[in-house]
Amino acid sequence: MSRHWPLFDLRITTPRLQLQLPTEELCDQLIDTILEGVHDPDRMPFSVPWTRASREDLPFNTLSHLWQQLAGFKRDDWSLPLAVLVDGRAVGVQALSSKDFPITRQVDSGSWLGLRYQGHGYGTEMRAAVLYFAFAELEAQVATSRSFVDNPASIAVSRRNGYRDNGLDRVAREGAMAEALLFRLTRDDWQRHRTVEVRVDGFDRCRPLFGPLEPPRY
């Protein structure tokens, strides 16, 4: 399939992790990881409470979401749901997305990690991986992210990678108002805070899919 869709050959590698688009086998592993648990059931770290689905529905919902993201890839509106592998096993997803990237040169990120893989620094490392890809390969100028104020682990990941606070947002979460911290990372701040070695393979054939980059016009 990579002959026609080169993004399947993209690999982003750090000292402990490898990130790539999920194959059929990796989708199965991701579903197993989800069924083992992603967060404490008393908490909800996501604005869309997808983890509340029944065990019977979670596999289909997961596949449907991943396939929708892959099928909907366009150069002016894309999302890369990269499977995060530890010792060859898929333990979570690190997504990178953008709208009108050739013009805005801005990316956003989101992620989840299996509960038993949390607390080992993988969250910081997988974010560092996609930030390197965004700034070094795609030549992004700004990266954004957000975390609910009651999610200190996610907040810490952003701050360790050099993001600056960029305000608050109010959103509905499971029928109630919740506040989210907004974060912004410039190219200069990213370069100053880089601590993780990252290697990208297989991007040359992918580059045309992201379109010609235009200098920002204000």
From Swiss-Prot:
GO biological process per UniProt: succinyl-CoA metabolic process
Annotated N-acetyltransferase domain residues: 32-188
Catalytic activity reported: L-lysyl-[protein] + acetyl-CoA = N(6)-acetyl-L-lysyl-[protein] + CoA + H(+); succinyl-CoA + L-lysyl-[protein] = N(6)-succinyl-L-lysyl-[protein] + CoA + H(+)
Enzyme class: transferase
Positions bound to substrate: 94, 109-113, 119-124, 145-151, 160
UniProt-listed Pfam families: Acetyltransf_3 (PF13302)
Record-listed E.C. numbers: 2.8.1.-
Disulfides per UniProt: none
Classification via SUPFAM superfamilies: Acyl-CoA N-acyltransferases (Nat)
GO annotations of cellular component type: cytoplasm
Keywords: Acyltransferase, Transferase
GO molecular function: protein N-terminal-serine acetyltransferase activity; protein-lysine-acetyltransferase activity; protein-N-terminal-alanine acetyltransferase activity
Subunit comment: Dimer of dimers.
Role noted for this protein: Acetylates and succinylates nucleoid-associated, DNA-binding protein HupB.
Record-given protein name: Acetyl- and succinyl-CoA transferase Rv0802c
Source organism phylogeny: Bacteria, Bacillati, Actinomycetota, Actinomycetes, Mycobacteriales
